[in-house]
Amino acid sequence: MNRFTGKAAFVTGAGGYIGGTIAKMLAKDGACVAVCDLNEETALRTVREIEEAGGRAIAVACNVTDSASVDRAMERAVTAFGRMDILVHAAGGSARSAMKPLIEQTDEVIQSVLGVNLLGGIYASRAAAREMVRQGEGGRIVNISSVVALEGLRGCVEYAASKGGLIAMTRSLCKELAPCGITVNTVAPGIVQRPGETNDAVHTNFLGIRCTAEDVAHVVLFLASDEARFVTGQTYAVDGGRSLAMKGTD
């Protein structure tokens, strides 16, 4: 039996590279997946790939910066699957800001980055936690942060703040939800490369290899599984050791 047979998952940003890979791997391992994305077309593309592989999924258009939109999306997922067991907040790719000193950054970019990365995580976690608490069978919440939140990086102040906020939220929320058997953890990837990309990212980690979305997804699936039942409030860096050498300025 697959690890997630009988489980329902809600993945934000699942029309993107990392979120889509996580959604597909959850489905391959037996989960029913709500593929949530601001862009419904990209969500549908992920759903088609899941269905072609024999999995079950629905596409849900969702603006994670709007709490009402998140609540509606969660309601639709629960209606479709009858339950909710796993949340992965992976939305954020479209909110990446151009690297600029904070004194040059615009309000629009700052609000967008904080809205998608941090507020989106808070809204999605609240919606999922409500369903998990109501069910009374525990659950798993996994937020996608970044190694930038661990060590800082010039030109990314608002991005680091938003991803660092997810880590702080994880540490607090895990304490609130622990009595309900719900774990909350964070995964902090380094530079994740798409197939065919070539750049110097391979030189920014100790292992000297490229990080793929699958590398991130493997850790997410562990944290979403029963194998991680005794793991909560933690942040897992998936970066080949890069965060150990960043020193805030690299």
Positions of PLM-derived features:
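Short, small/polar-rich loop/turn modules that mediate ligand/substrate recognition or access, typified
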Residues: 83, 178, 183, 231-233
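Canonical Rossmann dinucleotide-binding motif of NAD(H)/NADP(H)-dependent dehydrogenases/reductases
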Residues: 2-34
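Residue(s) in the substrate-gating loop at a strand-loop-helix junction
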Residues: 146
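Alpha-helical segment proximal to the catalytic Tyr-Lys
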Residues: 130, 175-179, 229
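Short C-terminal tail/terminal secondary-structure segment
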Residues: 94, 99, 151, 221, ...
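Active-site helix of classical SDR
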Residues: 125, 162, 170
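Substrate-binding pocket helix/loop in short-chain dehydrogenase/reductase
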Residues: 98-102, 106-111, 201
